[in-house]
Amino acid sequence: SVGFKAGVKDYRLTYYTPEYETLATDILAAFRVTPQPGVPPEEAGAAVAAESSTGTWTTVWTDGLTSLDRYKGRCYHIEPVAGEENQYIAYVAYPLDLFEEGSVTNMFTSIVGNVFGFKALRALRLEDLRIPPAYSKTFQGPPHGIQVERDKLNKYGRPLLGCTIKPKLGLSAKNYGRAVYECLRGGLDFTKDDENVNSQPFMRWRDRFLFCTEAIYKAQAETGEIKGHYLNATAGTSEEMIKRAVCARELGVPIVMHDYLTGGFTANTSLAHYCRDNGLLLHIHRAMHAVIDRQRNHGIHFRVLAKALRMSGGDHIHSGTVVGKLEGERDVTLGFVDLLRDDFIEKDRSRGIYFTQDWVSMPGVLPVASGGIHVWHMPALTEIFGDDSVLQFG
């Protein structure tokens, strides 16, 4: 019969297309899908493709007013996960037109906005994204990148050294600045505000900025090296964040810092643009990442959050330490460290890289090894991360 038929249809009739040849402009996603008992994997994979693109739970007459073939996400391949019962990797291709240019926020809202609460799925994890050059070229990316940072700092052929000022909460601004001076004078390249140092009653941000700047200039004068302190510009509103970055620029310091997940991608991208326009380096902390990436079978893998940060913009990002953890984790960590630093990364499933990623000429991000590391870890850290990294102690 011709005409419109309402009713609930299986997603796989429309959204599971194993014969589909992916386009060079498609955004590709690899999801780890755990279907509910009785739900076939093809239906679960198609449901993800539908709900994160053009589909809804039923057919509506307005579907006829657009071209689904042009705009729908497609689940084009499904494979079982070795060694896991009832787990599959579903590959989904999204047409480029579904996404706003230069917006990580919109990309995530589309791809992971709704599907994770889906009834047909017991659990869902976004393992990897392939960002085509046609899309990544709409982003500024890191404010400066690895090479420009080395030129600004005049430090080459070695990892950069930093430490976080402790106790992280409770010091007055003056004593905080004193600790910054001692660390920088003693030979570190950078000191760091802790991620939860914003502007608390015992130390308001402007006081901290002034005393830290004094410490930087004093240490620079005495050592003849360029020094920096990651001044945390993260704030309760985007306007306040930019205000703090403006103050840092006026004080003439080299680098500011942002918590990109708690602060949000929109704020982070604004800050990255400001930093490039004004010659500030941008250090990114990943506070809250484990809420999103820790579960093996649900959430978003950190390599996706790392790719998103490279697009949104940051010159440093915390990326784990590898030291003392499992060997397998080492390969996976090195996988996303390469995704942060290199121009072109080959698909390599043993390192968790599901797609070949071509960043073309987008600047790289320095990985920051941070969290529970001390001097005895140095040989392992330099072997794992090589020269292009920041070793952040404390």
UniProtKB/Swiss-Prot annotation:
PROSITE patterns according to UniProt: RUBISCO_LARGE
Keyword DNA damage: no
Cellular compartments per GO CC: chloroplast
Subcellular location: Plastid, Chloroplast
Pfam families: RuBisCO_large, RuBisCO_large_N
UniProt xrefs under SUPFAM superfamilies: RuBisCo, C-terminal domain, RuBisCO, large subunit, small (N-terminal) domain
Site-annotated residues for Transition state stabilizer: K325
Annotated GO MF terms: magnesium ion binding; monooxygenase activity; ribulose-bisphosphate carboxylase activity
This enzyme's EC code(s): 4.1.1.39
Gene3D superfamilies reported in the protein's UniProt record: Ribulose bisphosphate carboxylase, large subunit, C-terminal domain, RuBisCO large subunit, N-terminal domain
InterPro entries reported for this sequence: RuBisCO, RuBisCo_large_chain_AS, RuBisCO_lsu_C, RuBisCO_lsu_C_sf, RuBisCO_lsu_fd_N, RuBisCO_lsu_N_sf
Top-level EC class: lyase
Cofactor: Mg(2+)
Catalytic activity from the UniProt record: 2 (2R)-3-phosphoglycerate + 2 H(+) = D-ribulose 1,5-bisphosphate + CO2 + H2O; D-ribulose 1,5-bisphosphate + O2 = 2-phosphoglycolate + (2R)-3-phosphoglycerate + 2 H(+)
Keywords from the named record: Calvin cycle, Carbon dioxide fixation, Chloroplast, Lyase, Magnesium, Metal-binding, Methylation, Monooxygenase, Oxidoreductase, Photorespiration, Photosynthesis, Plastid
Residues binding substrate, per UniProt: N114, T164, K168, R286, H318, S370
Active site residues per record: K166 (proton acceptor), H285 (proton acceptor)
Recorded superkingdom: Eukaryota
Endpoints of the signal sequence: none
Cell cycle is among the record's keywords: no
Family the UniProt entry places it in: Belongs to the RuBisCO large chain family. Type I subfamily.
NCBIfam families found in the cross-reference section: PRK04208.1
Subunit structure: Heterohexadecamer of 8 large chains and 8 small chains.
Protein name from the UniProt record: Ribulose bisphosphate carboxylase large chain
Gene name of the encoded protein: rbcL
